[in-house]
A protein has these predicted regions:
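Conserved pre-motif I regulatory segment
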Residues: 13-60
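Charged, alpha-helix-enriched surfaces in structured cytosolic catalytic cores
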Residues: 23, 27, 42, 46, ...
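Conserved nucleic-acid-binding Ia/Ib motif block in the N-terminal RecA-like helicase ATPase lobe
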Residues: 30, 34, 85-130
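Nucleotide phosphate-binding site architecture
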Residues: 38, 58, 76, 80, ...
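Walker A/P-loop NTP-binding motif
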Residues: 48-57, 69-86, 110-113
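The conserved Walker
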Residues: 61-65
Length: 130
């Protein structure tokens, strides 16, 4: 009986989840709206809150389920949020196994950070002349 109730509750929570519930910076929420995302995917619902809270996570999901946004949105959130400690602040380095994936990640990062000040993305790949 408890398991059935828990599954029902989880299903209900997933149906009602919005990006506003994920504690992201208002500018990030605006970028999500401009990107046309209606609601977070399952991987985003599970990963974003944990990453925003400062946890390290390891997650996997099928292609096309929103994994890139699941790690990029909290990274951008952290970059534009006021620092809690003194210092130069956070920086982000994303490593990708293929050139195509690196370019896709940069494209998504540019889309989400379009209206954010002082955010610069650079894609560096090997094996090609510059």
């Amino acid at each position: 009986m408890v398991k059935k109730y828990k599954m029902h509750l989880l299903h209900k929570l997933e149906k009602e989840m919005t990006f506003n519930n994920l504690c992201l910076h208002p500018k990030i929420l605006k970028a999500i709206q401009l990107a046309g995302y209606p609601k977070p995917t399952e991987i985003q619902q599970k990963a974003i809150p944990k990453i925003v809270q400062g946890f390290d996570i390891r997650a996997s999901a099928q292609t096309g389920t929103g994994k890139t946004a699941a790690f990029l949105l909290p990274a951008l959130h952290r970059l534009i949020s006021p620092a809690t400690k003194s210092g130069i602040g956070p920086r982000v380095l994303i490593l990708a196994p293929t050139r195509e994936l690196a370019q896709q990640i940069e494209s998504q990062a540019n889309k989400y950070s379009k209206s954010l000040q002082r955010i610069k993305t650079v894609c560096v790949v090997g094996g090609m002349p510059y």
